[in-house]
Amino acid sequence: MAHACVSTSASSLRFTAGFVSASPNGSSFDSPKLSLPFEPLRSRKTNKLVSDRKNWKNSTPKAVYSGNLWTPEIPSPQGVWSIRDDLQVPSSPYFPAYAQGQGPPPMVQERFQSIISQLFQYRIIRCGGAVDDDMANIIVAQLLYLDAVDPTKDIVMYVNSPGGSVTAGMAIFDTMRHIRPDVSTVCVGLAASMGAFLLSAGTKGKRYSLPNSRIMIHQPLGGAQGGQTDIDIQANEMLHHKANLNGYLAYHTGQSLEKINQDTDRDFFMSAKEAKEYGLIDGVIMNPLKALQPLAAA
């Protein structure tokens, strides 16, 4: 007779599917036999890991945001076959990287652009990321628009850039000098190379930095290829940009041209306090809330 629990009878026992039955022969013992309606949990987990190990590379990557990088999130099996292959993919807000499946979802892009638009209504623009033609075109358009809307109110430009194209940076610089409103510049994070040049190009008395920012100046970088004449042309062009940038830096900082030439011969890093002493900026903002409004002259 079958029972739903283990019997303590002296008769021999036979293991069936979750039931215990008495053996028809009480004098001998049958070998235990286990019959389950499904595989044990350990076997199912092992089979699942083997299946995941075969299929995880074929799964569609999902992009997740990490700092300034968009990292495709590839499902990876856990356990003895755990493999993680992280690929750092740089992205730029000026290019719809989501179209290639490696950028933020459209909703994230819309929210980001919405925040930028809200700041723009308060005459706050950003110079963030590498300085290239696309960034320059956007900033130039923003400066011209704000000049047309109200030429009497200051414009605040936040700089967090490692530098970039000299010609693109000069387009922004010339527009800053061309428009009527004062342009207050604020360094947030890093202003290096062309980023530092644009930071120093703000209206004198209205150039600021947050306390933990870093600022770096150096000479233009580039390369050339082709015949000797081609290389000479490119070398002369680099010398022109170097002399032009150093001349403006000397004017913006009050340093002598000889000192600027010497300091920019190699990467010259400064803290916010050192940049103020050097003349690149006019003050260090210890209270970040003050930077949310157009800044008065020091």
UniProtKB/Swiss-Prot annotation:
Q: Where is the transit peptide?
A: 1-100
Query: Per its UniProt record, what InterPro entries does this chain match?
Result: ClpP, ClpP/crotonase-like_dom_sf, ClpP/TepA, ClpP_His_AS, ClpP_Ser_AS
> Which keywords fit this entry according to its UniProt record?
Acetylation, Chloroplast, Hydrolase, Plastid, Protease, Serine protease, Transit peptide, Ubl conjugation
Q: Where is the active site?
A: 193 (nucleophile), 218
Give the sites modified to N-acetylglycine: 101
Task: List, alphabetically, the Gene3D superfamilies matched.
Answer: 2-enoyl-CoA Hydratase, Chain A, domain 1 (3.90.226.10)
The annotated phenotype of a deletion mutant is: Embryo lethal.
**Where are the disulfide bridges?**
none
A GO biological process of this protein is:
proteolysis
One GO molecular function term? serine-type endopeptidase activity
Chief localisation class:
plastid
Task: Please outline how this chain is modified post-translation.
Answer: Ubiquitinated in vitro by CHIP.
Reactions catalysed = Hydrolysis of proteins to small peptides in the presence of ATP and magnesium. alpha-casein is the usual test substrate. In the absence of ATP, only oligopeptides shorter than five residues are hydrolyzed (such as succinyl-Leu-Tyr-|-NHMec, and Leu-Tyr-Leu-|-Tyr-Trp, in which cleavage of the -Tyr-|-Leu- and -Tyr-|-Trp bonds also occurs)
Q: Which family does it belong to?
A: Belongs to the peptidase S14 family.
Q: How does it assemble?
A: Component of the chloroplastic Clp protease core complex which consist of at least 16 proteins: CLPP4 (3 copies), CLPP5 (3 copies), CLPR4 (2 copies), ClpP1 (1 copy), CLPP6 (1 copy), CLPR2 (1 copy), CLPT1 (1 copy), CLPT2 (1 copy) and 3 copies of CLPP3 and/or CLPR1 and/or CLPR3. The core complex is organized in two heptameric rings, one containing CLPP3,4,5,6 in a 1:2:3:1 ratio and the other CLPP1 and CLPR1,2,3,4 in a 3:1:1:1:1 ratio. Interacts with CHIP.
The function of this protein is:
Cleaves peptides in various proteins in a process that requires ATP hydrolysis. Has a chymotrypsin-like activity. Plays a major role in the degradation of misfolded proteins.
The protein's name: ATP-dependent Clp protease proteolytic subunit 5, chloroplastic
Native source organism of the sequence: Arabidopsis thaliana
